[in-house]
Amino acid sequence: MKIPARLKPNSRHREEVVVGSDGTYIIYTKAPAIEGRANAAAIKLLAKYFGVPQSRVKLVRGARAKHKVFLIDI
């Protein structure tokens, strides 16, 4: 299934996934948006949230943007 998400890198919050009022997943991560570190952290958090291995979570759109689309193979 495709998951629309908004990534919040360098977050002071704890690392977590929250569902927004519009159905978009908001991903808070402490990783910086440098060299794909925030994207890797987002994949790890989404895998934990949905209870699937990290290999089943793929970034489909938005590799260099805050608004992203992930594909999760459940």
Predicted region positions:
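Contiguous, often N-terminal, cationic amphipathic patches that form binding interfaces
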Residues: 1-36, 40-43, 52-54, 58-64, ...
